[in-house]
C-alpha cells in the first residue's frame, strides 16, 4: 500500500497535511503521534469511511476508491480501537466471519482449513469454543486479529493494539 500526499480538511482547518508513506507487502507500519495528529483520519480515509480532499491511497496498484467493496474486503482488513462485539459468539464463530467475503456464509472445507490455520497462528486453539466475552482483552484482540488475517493484510487503527498481543 502506498499513501501519497494525503490531505484532509475540516471547516478550513487542515487535519492531515500531505501525508506520504508506504507499507511493503508483509510489513507493518505504526502511525504514532499525539491526540489530534490525524492518525484516525488517515485510517478513516484508507478504510474509505472518510473522503480525502487530495492525495492517493494506492492498494495493490489501484486507487482504493476504485475497488469494489466485495473485492476489497477479500484483500484488506481493518481493526479498530474499539472492538466490542455485541453478539454472543465463540472464537471460532468470530473467525469464521472473516471468511464471509469468500464464502458468502457457506463455508467450504478450504474455508475451514484457513479458519483452523488462523486460530492456530494466533494460539487460540484452547479458546476456540469459548465465547468472546469470556476472554481476556489480549485473547479477544488475538481473536480479532485471527478474523482479519484471512486475507493476509492487516491495517490497525491503534499502534498499541499489536503490542498488547
Regions found by a protein language model. Give the residues of each.
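Conserved ABC transporter NBD signature motif
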Residues: 55-63
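Conserved ABC ATPase signature
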Residues: 107, 131-135, 139
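The feature captures the beta-strand-to-loop junction immediately N-terminal to the Walker
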Residues: 32-34
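Signature (C-motif/LSGGQ) region and adjacent switch/coupling loops
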Residues: 87, 128-129
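Conserved ABC ATPase "signature" region
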Residues: 96, 109-127
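Conserved structural motif at the start of ABC-family nucleotide-binding domains
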Residues: 1, 16-18
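ABC ATPase NBD coupling module
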Residues: 63-77, 82, 105-108, 112
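Helix-to-loop junction immediately C-terminal to a conserved catalytic motif
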Residues: 47
